[in-house]
Amino acid sequence: MRVSKYLLSTQKETPANAEVISHQLMLRAGMIRRNASGLYSYLPTGLRVLRKVEAIVREEMNKAGAIEILMPMVQPADLWVETGRWDKFGPELLRFKDRHNRDFVLGPTHEEVITDLIRKEVSSYKQLPLNLYQIQTKFRDEVRPRFGVMRSREFLMKDAYSFHLDVDTMNETYEAMYQAYSNILSRMGLAFRPVLADTGSIGGSMSHEFHVLAQSGEDLIAYSTGSDYAANIEKAESPMPTEARGAATEELRLVDTPNAKTIAELVEQFGLDITKTVKTLIVKGATEEAPLVALIVRGDHELNEIKADKLDLVASPLEFAPEALIRDAIGAGPGSLGPVGLNMPIIIDHSVSVMSDFAAGANQDDKHYFGINWERDLPLAQAADIRNVVEGEPTPDGLGTYAMARGIEVGHIFQLGTNYSKSMNATVLDENGKSQVLLMGCYGVGVSRIVAAAIEQNFDDRGIVWPEAIAPFSVGILPMNMHKSHRVTDIAEQLYKDLSAAGIDVLLDDRKERPGVMFADMELIGIPHTVVIGDRNIDAGVFEYKNRRTGEKQDVPFDQIVDFLKNLQA
């Protein structure tokens, strides 16, 4: 490709409304342009990267035995009503009526459509197992699209769905998809971690997320320092206390705390050990008999809302009680709540169950109890794992301690079981002629999100530093003063032809531009390898090669340059 016949569209200045580095660099490098909130057009450079990501995804899915299909982006609402997600999904599901007043949605995912397809096309166990995938545009009407294509409303996704009659083949396909996703990210040269994850709105039993590691990642990953164990912070298991509860050494006493509205203020004003305090959070209950439930964690711990949402007594989705409701039920507001004398179900974190002589709100405004002890001042409450893990704690496998990293979720695999097939009556006849509900798996990769995640992991102060496999071009040719030197023009043109003939993606900057502008553009768009041609190089019979990632420069003889560059890509 020649720059003179290409839409390069680079920008010197960082756009003011671009929050994260990938959004900034995708705009500056001329990869995308915003059409509306969360909607982007891909310019040639961006599309080249997107297509390379897509190609790797497709190759690995095919290797894993999945079969490509294509389903419509527009889906009939009847299917969503059938599974119950028409009411459950919320405003992210964009709904509309056609000219005949029939309800439709823009698909954020395709479980309903694929299940409907399979129940009509597959009738016998002999046709199973089956794993079908597509690479298709999705739409989620995000309340606040941000970070460019990282969290846009319209995005490109690979979604696969597998169908089984038995758990063994479902597990086999799950493992095959796990390996395929690992292969995809490895081939792209990205540092990543597969982590145990919550199944979220899709549902199901087993779930893993695949995260590209980046300091800007929205997700916190808890991983073991001594094994491969890793989990999203929402899913990471807190260790059970190994120590016994200490004996009571303090009397229960009521203390005035007018200026202590938070745990931090309480600790600072009264010189308390934060591990001797608890936080009491009131949420809505799941039953009429218990409309409110108290959740209690240690003062230095954070409530894990995903874990709390799964408690039988807690209404789902989790909803914190408003202050007016709390005051009406307890007589005090947030900041003064605690377990002593509380007339509602109480669920404490396991770490709270071994506490003694601790402080908590007294359920009176501006008052706390100090010296609280279980089984003396109140019955020991029901305990569960309801908190986030903390760095340094032992991991569940016993092979290390927790460390933390930030990641960007780019893939998610689920074992759905019969979540969708049962509600949609997707069945086949088994070998005995008996009707069986299909087991399902679901496997998604954010194709367009990978592009942004790769940039978040690979950039410097000059621009993007693409991994070789997904760079828009592999080699950039920079002829110095090409339009003033016939020798430079001839050598540059010949090199361009030779590299193109060798199957190398090459960009020849044949513009009448200053060398500084040409170098800056090549570095901004992140081309891994550049070859500089000038009269001095020609006199010496060498090209000047520069590696974008390392900055290394070296002279390469004319007759060796093609093999040299091909070897770098091997």
UniProtKB/Swiss-Prot annotation:
GO terms for biological process: prolyl-tRNA aminoacylation. Transmembrane segments: none annotated. It is found in: Cytoplasm. Its EC number is 6.1.1.15. Keywords: Aminoacyl-tRNA synthetase, ATP-binding, Cytoplasm, Ligase, Nucleotide-binding, Protein biosynthesis. CDD domains: ProRS-INS, ProRS_anticodon_short, ProRS_core_prok. Its main location: cytoplasm. One of its GO terms (molecular function) is ATP binding. InterPro entries: aa-tRNA-synt_IIb, aa-tRNA-synth_II, aa-tRNA-synth_II/BPL/LPL, Anticodon-bd, Anticodon-bd_dom_sf, Pro-tRNA-ligase_IIa, Pro-tRNA-synth_IIa_bac-type, Pro-tRNA-Synthase_IIa_type1. Homodimer. Consists of three domains: the N-terminal catalytic domain, the editing domain and the C-terminal anticodon-binding domain. HAMAP family: Pro_tRNA_synth_type1. Catalyzes the attachment of proline to tRNA(Pro) in a two-step reaction: proline is first activated by ATP to form Pro-AMP and then transferred to the acceptor end of tRNA(Pro). As ProRS can inadvertently accommodate and process non-cognate amino acids such as alanine and cysteine, to avoid such errors it has two additional distinct editing activities against alanine. One activity is designated as 'pretransfer' editing and involves the tRNA(Pro)-independent hydrolysis of activated Ala-AMP. This is Proline--tRNA ligase. The gene is proS.
